[in-house]
């Protein structure tokens, strides 16, 4: 069973500190969830995430359904036994991946028929099937099956998807058979404020254990994302956890928290780490750049992670450019540690009543492209709005 308690609130914003308690762990919120689509974050072990302080990880039902299969995982004792991850797990229903990764997708009110992005095999997932798969996987928190639309989309398409998501939400609730697994509903509605409000007002009375905002970070500008949060979050009850799906750039974490969000997930820290992007307190470092060949300083002087306290930028540049596997691992460790530390700082500021000053100081210091030069900066721009950011991590 899941319980959620609010411990502190911020007088200058909607930020709050709380605890999300499952049978396996107590998670301090606001919290960021690392994404291990196939059961683990690439290049990391469960112990690595434990050392960083993470108590909740996201696994993806779409990927695990395709391989090794939800029935195989159930036979092996469920995700916790299979992966040896001792803390809480949230599974994304796979709706986003069905509509973004699949080679072919036909959607009706009954469900979605799609072809696997792996081998082209045809599959059908209904709301009931999505719940069945997630219950077999055995996560602590599972998600309703939703229809996520790409942007831009026509107003009619966005409205139809929001209505279908509500229809599917009711069916997911009816299909839910394991009370020890919390079930979250998802709000859709694109960039239409009125539709977002309507979706939230229709979903809240259904009685989900938590509420998620989906369909953002799919190509829209940041002001549009924040505008949708500004109208949607006030419609959600303060007594239940609020989850912003697939959003995870540092500046978005700070702004999401300010608007009352409790949970985030994104592949950004792990995927960017594997491609050589390192997050720091002042911006991002592209470690492949030649400027770091002789740089003896750590990636971030302010970071307490084992990478920054042990290795230089020069060494990280070396292992990355020679394609040593250790390079991707060290980069991922640093990035996920940076995200965990950022969330700790946010929670501390809220508890101490200094979140407003923390927020202002963060935006003064953090520049997403501060350490990126020329064409590399240009190539970085699309990553911010990559519509597959909730994909394979």
Language-model segments: which ranges?
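A non-catalytic, amphipathic alpha-helix used as a structural packing/dimerization or gating element
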Residues: 129, 133, 137, 160, ...
């Amino acid at each position: 069973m899941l319980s959620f308690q609010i411990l502190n609130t911020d007088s200058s914003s909607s930020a709050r500190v709380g605890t999300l308690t499952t049978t396996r762990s107590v998670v301090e919120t606001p919290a960021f969830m690392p994404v291990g689509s196939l059961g683990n974050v690439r290049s990391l072990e469960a112990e690595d995430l434990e050392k960083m302080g993470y108590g909740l990880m996201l696994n993806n039902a779409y990927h695990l359904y395709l391989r090794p299969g939800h029935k195989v995982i159930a036979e092996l004792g469920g995700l916790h036994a299979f992966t040896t991850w001792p803390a809480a797990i949230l599974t994304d229903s796979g709706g986003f991946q069905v509509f973004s990764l699949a080679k072919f997708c036909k959607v009706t009110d009954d469900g979605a028929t799609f072809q696997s992005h792996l081998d082209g095999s045809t599959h059908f997932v209904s709301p009931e099937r999505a719940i069945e798969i997630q219950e077999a996987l055995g996560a602590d928190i599972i998600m309703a099956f939703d229809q996520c639309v790409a942007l831009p989309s026509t107003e009619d398409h966005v409205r139809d998807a929001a209505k279908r998501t509500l229809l599917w939400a009711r069916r997911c609730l009816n299909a839910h058979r394991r009370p020890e697994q919390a079930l979250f509903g998802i709000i859709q509605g694109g960039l239409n404020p009125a539709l977002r409000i309507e979706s939230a007002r229709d979903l809240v009375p259904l009685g989900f254990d938590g509420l998620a905002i989906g369909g953002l970070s799919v190509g829209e500008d940041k002001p549009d994302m924040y505008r949708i949060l500004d109208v949607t979050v006030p419609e959600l009850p303060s007594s239940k956890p609020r989850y912003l799906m697939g959003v995870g750039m540092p500046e978005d974490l700070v702004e999401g928290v300010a608007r009352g969000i409790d949970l985030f997930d994104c592949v950004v820290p792990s995927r960017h780490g594997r491609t050589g992007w390192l997050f720091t307190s002042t911006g991002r470092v592209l470690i492949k750049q030649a400027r770091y060949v002789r740089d003896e300083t750590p990636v971030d002087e302010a970071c307490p992670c084992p990478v920054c306290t042990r290795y230089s930028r020069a060494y990280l540049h070396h292992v990355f450019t020679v394609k040593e596997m250790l390079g991707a691992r060290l980069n991922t460790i640093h990035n996920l540690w940076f995200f965990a530390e950022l969330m700790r700082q946010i929670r501390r500021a809220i508890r101490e009543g200094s979140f407003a000053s923390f927020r202002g100081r963060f935006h003064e210091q953090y520049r997403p492209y501060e350490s990126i030069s020329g064409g590399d900066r240009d190539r970085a721009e699309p990553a911010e709005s990559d519509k597959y950011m909730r994909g394979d991590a």
